[in-house]
């Protein structure tokens, strides 16, 4: 699937809508090179939940967004020098029911972050982004069945 930037955000919003009423801890890996659109995807996802101002957690490592019934933690692991740095910030304390983790650069935190329910590979530059989705769990499959490809 190929998307322009606004279409990528719309797809992310559709994914968020499919996850809105699932009452369990869920993990989404956002995979791609620098500038591929991982943070753009996260913005579209968070826009669905009413967050218009979404900043990249590149320097803070994690930004948290709370709604009435969901907590979304947006992680950017790009700057980690050691995956165990996430243990130092208490990543396990972020894993709760009704919680979603959006994790950019999950390969930098291998062995520390939870396995994904959904992995999203974003490739491309300029105007178009190619998206490849993979399910890592039953709940991931359930979410995929809701999506309108």
Can you annotate each of these PLM segments?
Residues 1-18:
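N-terminal pre-Walker A segment at the start of P-loop NTPase domains
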Residues 18-25:
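Phosphate-binding P-loop
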Residues 27-29:
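Short hydrophobic/aromatic beta-strand immediately N-terminal to the Walker A/P-loop
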Residues 31-33:
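P-loop (Walker A) phosphate-binding loop of NTP-binding proteins
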Residues 38:
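Conserved lysine of the Walker
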């Amino acid at each position: 699937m190929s998307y322009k930037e606004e279409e990528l955000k719309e797809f992310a919003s559709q994914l968020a809508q499919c996850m809105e009423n699932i009452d369990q801890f869920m993990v989404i890996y956002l995979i791609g090179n620098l500038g591929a659109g991982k943070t753009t995807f996260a913005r579209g996802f968070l826009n669905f939940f009413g967050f218009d101002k979404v900043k990249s957690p590149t320097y803070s490592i994690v930004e948290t967004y709370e709604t009435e019934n969901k907590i979304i933690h947006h992680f950017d692991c790009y700057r980690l020098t050691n995956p165990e740095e996430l243990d130092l910030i208490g990543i396990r304390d972020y894993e709760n029911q009704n919680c979603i983790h959006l994790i950019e650069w999950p390969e930098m935190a291998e062995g520390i972050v939870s396995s994904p329910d959904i992995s999203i590979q974003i490739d491309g530059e300029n105007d178009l982004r190619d998206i490849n989705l993979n399910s890592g769990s039953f709940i991931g499959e359930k979410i995929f069945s809701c999506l309108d490809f």
